[in-house]
């Protein structure tokens, strides 16, 4: 029988570990770690300038309603149906120039409306000259690729637009058949579309008119650089190119020079920053009580929409099981799940069937999750850029939000680096009273043991299934 979480009340009284002694332990441990291990690389330097060939425009309102753009009626009807009323800054800055046929480099965070900023001009152009393989949109993750396809499908619903999503983890033959149906819009991860360009007979992008690189900084962070180089060599040089990124780094500037021609740069935000309406804090915890503090926080924010970020797939899976055993409605999201499992988790969280999403950094950027109340950093991220993207999942579209980071004695170096980039110290939230925490710890310890057992059983069953399948094939 699943244990019901005890309702824990927040208090400023005695904590599990005295804050001063814990801080001293943290400092000692950090000095020890500094001698023993190399420091994690700093995030790539952000550059404030672009090449002389680019034209900078400010993010002031270029138009006030979509009806001012003289779009085709079918596209306008879809825009109205989707309730796009007032353009976002990136849409206002980019769309007019894109409709003039100019290359665009857009600097904007996830959730700024940038998908529509490139989809609307492409669909307007496609209406005037419909042909297959018209546009290729490259995305760093499968989830983002599916969401971009959904936006194209919704905006192109009255135009007869055919789109396809080409990502890893799906059957190559099925995808080849989809490509042979000659879709107008291809949304893909770089590695998989390159596989098809090299191996799928009859498929080429010689007639491509538009290339979009979305979340380009992340494409490069995830080592898609070589695949991007190959793609740029096999597509027409005479094309329109849009590059969207959260930040302007040296790598992005280099990619811009290699792929764009006299682009217009629209910068909504190109610095490390968090939203003004985001309340950020941290809790000093001892490593052995980390799960207990997590459950305490899930109790505190009962009924809220919560994303918990962990560092590894194993932590994500185990923390999800722990939360479920203790009666919480939680779903996992990480790279070792199948595509259908990942989409299933996302849909449950977005629809409210589960109010807790426990995830690796795959959920930090690019996912369309409309309303998140709280972000909990169960594991401190390894760089400040990842921290800013994680906490940026809440306090969006003018709403307020809360983020809490659990900091152990092993996290000080990373934590101090994050504070340095933020430019201020995160306030410390008080721990619950010692007796309440210890009582909760007993339940959490028991549930943790059960979660570990279930994880082990699952892996053993999966290994046995693989062995049985192999034996059947050999017979």
From Swiss-Prot:
Residues 48-59 have a biased composition (Polar residues). It comes from the Eukaryota. It is found in: Nucleus. GO terms for molecular function: ATP binding; hydrolase activity; RNA binding; RNA helicase activity. The keyword 4Fe-4S does not apply. The lineage of its organism: Eukaryota, Fungi, Dikarya, Ascomycota, Saccharomycotina. This is ATP-dependent rRNA helicase RRP3. One of its GO terms (biological process) is maturation of SSU-rRNA from tricistronic rRNA transcript (SSU-rRNA, 5.8S rRNA, LSU-rRNA).
